[in-house]
Amino acid sequence: MASSSTSFPLTTAPPQGVRFNRRKPRLTVWAKQTAFQLGKTKGDDDSEGKQKGKNPFQFDFGKLPDMKSLIPVVTNPSTGLVFGNNRKKDPGTIFVAGATGQAGIRIAQTLLQRGFSVRAGVPDLGAAQDLARVAATYKILSNDEVKRLNAVQSPFQDAESIAKAIGNATKVVVTVGATENGPDAQVSTSDALLVVQAAELAGVSHVAIVYDGTISGSTYNVLDGITSFFGNLFAKSQPLTISDLIEKVAQTDVAYTLIKTSLTEDFSPEKAYNVVVSAEGSNSGSGSSSSEAYKVPKLKIASLVADIFANTAVAENKVVEVSTDPSAPSRPVDELFSVIPEDGRRKVYADAIARERAEEEAKVAADKAREAAEAAKEFEKQMQKLSEKEAEAASLAEDAQQKADAVGVTVDGLFNKAKDISSGLSWNKLGSQFATAIQNASETPKVQVATVRGQAKARNLPPKKAVVKQRPSSPFASKPKEERPKKPEKEVRKVFGGLFKQETIYIDDD
């Protein structure tokens, strides 16, 4: 949906605590007569200045080609939004994902008519503006409803960007169908899962998912079958089935209501039938899609979603199948959902998580017990080795004592003797012993030291020259014998049987 320029707020909600002036806004510009002016030449300004001298700032709004150009466009809603629980939530604000889809636009319109504020997530803000302008022009939406409509750009890309687009909404609705991402594009189960994950990030309290079962029906067209086959073959990931979607939604922390149905147009005969809500797997639900009588018009499913958001307690964590029946009476939403049991997938998942956590804790405890047992066993081995070493040391000491006793010497005695030797040994005593030994080894001096009295008497004697007596030489002193030269020795031997004699003479070189 889109709005007129005066009633379609496309900017983000103002921060809390900001006060607004309720008086009519007026544009006041203080400028001199020589200030710049728009759209006029200097000559024209001079000619008109005489007539309108009090209004120097001229601007002709009638020459604007389209008032739509004055509407601010939010190209990046993430810059003005804070996702998560940091922003104060509004219990009366609902985020409609795919608000320009065939069912999404009817859901947004019905919610506005019921008094809710709507944040419309759209893939194209320009198209949403056109729709809002048409709705306001033809009175499809009242001025009050248009004021409560806030469109934000929100393609199905990632959960973080969708969470920022959700903003202060406390409830979220998304429709899975072939014409729900705009008027002719598909919203898949994977896209719906992204919306649920974004709702969990944004702190949303309740999510409603409308699943149109006609998207999986056969068109009996060969080209469509070939296109679907090759599309699934070359796709990066296979699309989620509705069962997989419910399983993953049950694993989140957001309360949910999943509606399985087969949608039809509002001008079909089913618009006069009443809605029937049955439990999942019932034959009276949308499973009998072959019968045209059981389909649900889009306006009726939008009315059911609005009733659910008005009383979410009766529809929390339930998966239902919705159809129409001409013979069914009209019932309020609390009667329709009170007989539906709560979906058991979340409880099964919670039990599985608790069981897995208990098994993990038991495994950790078993590992710790095993490690403690191994540590105790290793400690016992170390203690056993230590006791064996102590016994071996004791036996060696006993053998040494026995050997010492055998030779008559005890170990204590040896230690005592060693102590005595070490105590009696000193460097001073050892030095004096060496000095005494050296003095005893020296010869006794020939000159005797006189007594004190003798020394005094010797000092008084006059000095005399010492006379040395020389021994007279004897004339008969024997002369040293001169050595006679040795005669050369001869050696004679007989040769040739005594016929000849050979004489060998040895002469000294001296």
UniProtKB/Swiss-Prot annotation:
Annotated region described as Disordered, given as residue ranges: 1-24, 38-58, 453-493
- What is an annotated GO biological process for this record, any one? circadian rhythm
| Transit peptide (residue range) | 1-19
Which residue intervals are annotated with compositional bias (Polar residues) in the record?
1-14
Cite the post-translational modification comment.
Answer: Excluded from chloroplast nucleoid when phosphorylated on Thr-451 by STN7 that may regulate membrane-anchoring functions of the nucleoid.
According to the UniProt record, list the residues that bear Phosphoserine.
395
Keyword field: Chloroplast, Coiled coil, Membrane, NADP, Phosphoprotein, Plastid, Thylakoid, Transit peptide
Name of the protein in its database record: Protein PLASTID TRANSCRIPTIONALLY ACTIVE 16, chloroplastic
Native source organism of the sequence: Arabidopsis thaliana (Mouse-ear cress)
